[in-house]
Amino acid sequence: MILGIDIGATKTRLARLESGELVKSRKIVTRRDSSRFFSDLTDLIEEFIGADRSRLKGIGIGAPGPLDLDRGVFRKLPNLPSWDGFDIRGKLESVYDVPVRVQNDANAAALGEAVHGGGRGFGSVYYITISTGIGGGLIMNRRIINGANYLAGEIWALPVDNFGQRDILINTSSGPGIVRTASRLMGEGSASSLSELDGFDTEDVFAQARKGDPLAARVMEQAARNMVHAVITILLAVDPEVVLIGGGLACADDCMINPIRRMLGETAFFAPHRSANIRKAELWDEAVLYGAASLFQP
């Protein structure tokens, strides 16, 4: 039995992988106290393995960074600061005497999609998630490419323009980034129907852009254009067979995926990249779980 664990800022999910399918997925609260969290986690693992611990062969974990991937230790997580130094790999290996493998959540999701989702059948897969943040992971022949400093594919930090300001991709194209950009432009005097709302979120910006609001349309257009800049960078660097896009902003094709395809066709230099294979991811919330369990694939 291989267990996959998806650690999030507020909840942690655990499942086992059997014949390529997730079985018996359960979740617990991600406690801020790492000791209490570990106690809850081991209680849940015991439920999965039952009395015969010999059934357990490995535990894979996908978790938010920063992480010391060499040692499986958490660093200063923005949402879980008290976890700094939490050696989850060492603790689990000590309790269960099985190998434990830890990856950042974007890479785990990329592996899950490559092996069990939209990347099945492709030798090279680049996965992007666009949601409250932006993450990316590169998979070659069903293996995660980490890079020399474990930073391969971290496109969220790509330098981009943000309406005349030097910025990075996450601040222009993630959900919160889109909202902040719209708020900033309104504060600088640009008119928008968004000002009539009692607060607004990414869905509101997108909805007003659909209705023809000029400011909302400009913000969404730039968010997509900067994502295209990131996609072209990946295409030029590693030339993957398929680029998968997941996360909340990929749910509606006309929000990000179709604009990315259109702009890619308009701006990419090489003809194969202008018609690159851009697809919607398939596994969504289960991608990290699939990927965590797949850290033990042959």
Positions of PLM-derived features:
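A short acidic/small-residue loop/turn micro-motif
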Residues: T30-R32, S82-W83, L151-E154
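General beta-strand structural signal in soluble alpha/beta enzymes
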Residues: V100-N104
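Hydrophobic alpha-helical segments within soluble ligand-binding/sensing domains
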Residues: A109-A110, G121
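Glycine-rich phosphate-binding loop of actin/hexokinase-like ATP-binding domains
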Residues: R120-S173
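Short hydrophobic alpha-helix segments
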Residues: R26-I28, P78, A148
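ATP-binding/phosphotransfer module of carbohydrate and carboxylate kinases, centering on a glycine-rich
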Residues: M1-G58, L67-V73, G90-V98, V115-F122, ...
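A charged helix-plus-loop insertion that forms the helical arch/lid used to bind
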Residues: V73-G85
